[in-house]
Amino acid sequence: MANLPTVLVTGASGRTGQIVYKKLKEGSDKFVAKGLVRSAQGKEKIGGEADVFIGDITDADSINPAFQGIDALVILTSAVPKMKPGFDPTKGGRPEFIFEDGQYPEQVDWIGQKNQIDAAKVAGVKHIVVVGSMGGTNPDHPLNKLGNGNILVWKRKAEQYLADSGTPYTIIRAGGLLDKEGGVRELLVGKDDELLQTDTKTVPRADVAEVCIQALLFEEAKNKAFDLGSKPEGTSTPTKDFKALFSQVTSRF
C-alpha cells in the first residue's frame, strides 16, 4: 500500500470542519486524517479518536504536536462572534455581537492562522487549503462591524501571508454558508466578490467541505484563490468534475 498523505484539519469540531474531518476519515483509501480542536468537548463531539489533538492556535507551542508528520493542512478555524446577553427580540432593534477575550479575529484569524502556516512550513507541508469568506474586498462589509472585530480584514491578511509563504496553497472564499445537502448543486467560482452581486452567493457547507477535499487531489487547485457560490438546487447539473472547476480559476489571490 502506498504511503497515503496525512491531512490535518484544524477547527475540526466546527460546523464545516466536522464535515471535512468526516470526509477525510471516509476517504481512508486516499488520506490519513488528523484533527485539531480547542477543547476536550470538541474532541468528544467528533468521536474522540486518538488522531484528534487539542491545542490553541493562538499559542504556537500548543499546536506543534498536531503538525508532526503531516503532508497537507486544511484550515477551518475562525473567530466566532457571540450575541451579547440581554437582547430581547420582542423589543425590535438588532442584537449586538461580541468576541470573547482571546478570541478576537486579530488573534484567531490572523495570529492563529499565521501560527498554523508557520507550523506547516516547519513540518514540510506540501499543500495548505484555507477556507475564508467572500466580502473581503469591501472594508465596510457588515461582517467587519460584528463586535468591531474586522474579521474579513484579518482573514485577508492571513490569506496574503499564506500566498507569500512559498507553500502551495488553495484559498476558498466561501459565500453565505447553508446547512443543506451537498453534491446536489452546480458550484460556481468567482473572484473579487463578483458573486455577491448575484443570487448565487450562498453555498452549502457540505459542498465547501467537498471542495477542500478535492483541492487536495488536483494540481489545478494549487496556488489559486477563488470565491465559491452555487446555483439553487434543481436549476442546473450538480458539479462532479472538480478538475474542470479548478481549471476555471486563474487568480492567485
Curated annotation (Swiss-Prot):
Family, per entry: Belongs to the NAD(P)-dependent epimerase/dehydratase family.
Modified residues (N-acetylalanine): A2
Name of this protein: Uncharacterized protein At5g02240
One Gene Ontology MF term: oxidoreductase activity
Protein origin, superkingdom: Eukaryota
Organism from which the protein derives: Arabidopsis thaliana (Mouse-ear cress)
One Pfam family here: NAD_binding_10
Keywords: Acetylation
One GO term describing the cellular component: chloroplast stroma
Oligomeric form and interacting partners: Homodimer.
GO BP term (any one): response to abscisic acid
